[in-house]
């Protein structure tokens, strides 16, 4: 029998608006600290998000501007960026996405097991969860970049999560907001709902989805289903997720 037993949440851009509210200013603060004559604007950073991982973005941008950065310098920039990111999180400068807290609370009350699967480091995730949810931690475990050898878009993070949870794939749902994340969860053969972040994204042609939402919604901000089952309420809730699993199962058969 198909029923909702577990939800795997991506973090950056899915649970919280971290990319523009924390990661981007942290990068620019690091450049300033180290005397690197860069200042990424929003459009530049959005383009760089196609590259997965902070160190990879620094290396890619350096190459694109014909600058010869050593691995040591790239590592130093990234370490400094991480410091500034944590400082920004401590100041509670990051907001939850619309409907996230409401849905997480409802799933918790329904005894649906919840997990985070992210490319962020464990120190980043722990601090962000602590600041966003205070004493309430609904997540059973976290798969971070520290826990796997290969990050998204490789399926390994989600395969590890499935192994640890023991939940049948067809009884779980993934929430993702990016091409690398979607490729990771789909390659792991997990039912996946795409909820875009506040950053424009063009889905890669080889990504085939059966559920796309513009947001999770709440009482004052209605969710729109771009693709998938109909909403019973103005927002995504436990019933909708169960409907989606049936929809997903029927689509496969």
Regions found by a protein language model. Name each.
Residues 34-46, 66-77, 135-139:
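Short, surface-exposed acidic
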Residues 14, 118-120:
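Conserved phosphate-coupling serine/threonine residues in phosphotransfer and NTP-handling enzymes
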Residues 2, 105, 121-122, 126-253:
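Asp-based, Mg2+/Mn2+-dependent phosphohydrolase catalytic module
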Residues 22, 53, 95-99, 120-121, ...:
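Short beta->alpha linker loops
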Residues 1-43:
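Active-site neighborhood of HAD-like aspartate-dependent phosphohydrolases
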Residues 63-101, 105, 110:
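Metal-dependent phosphoesterase signature
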Residues 30-32, 53-69:
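Helix-loop "lid/cap" segments that line or gate small-molecule binding pockets
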């Amino acid at each position: 029998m198909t029923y909702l037993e577990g939800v795997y949440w991506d973090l950056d851009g899915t649970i919280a608006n971290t990319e523009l509210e924390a990661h981007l200013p942290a990068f620019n603060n690091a450049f300033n600290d180290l005397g690197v004559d860069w200042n990424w604007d929003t459009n530049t950073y959005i383009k760089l998000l196609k590259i997965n991982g902070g160190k990879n973005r620094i290396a890619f941008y350096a190459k694109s501007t014909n600058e010869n950065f050593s691995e040591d310098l790239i590592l130093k920039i990234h370490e400094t960026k991480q410091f500034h990111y944590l400082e920004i999180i401590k100041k509670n400068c990051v907001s939850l996405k619309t409907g996230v807290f409401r849905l997480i609370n409802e799933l918790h009350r329904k005894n649906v097991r919840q997990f985070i699967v992210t490319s962020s480091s464990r120190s980043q995730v722990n601090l962000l969860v602590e600041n966003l949810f205070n004493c309430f931690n609904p997540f059973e475990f976290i798969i971070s970049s520290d826990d796997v050898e290969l990050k998204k878009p490789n399926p390994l993070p989600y395969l590890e999560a499935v192994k640890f949870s023991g939940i049948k794939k067809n009884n779980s749902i993934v929430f993702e907001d990016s091409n690398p994340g979607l490729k990771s969860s789909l390659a792991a053969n997990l039912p996946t709902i795409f909820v875009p972040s506040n950053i424009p994204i063009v889905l890669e042609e080889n990504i085939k989805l059966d559920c796309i939402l513009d947001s999770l919604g709440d009482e004052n901000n209605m969710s729109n289903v771009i693709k998938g089952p109909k909403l019973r309420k103005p927002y995504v809730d436990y019933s909708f997720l169960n409907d989606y699993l049936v929809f997903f199962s029927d689509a496969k058969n």
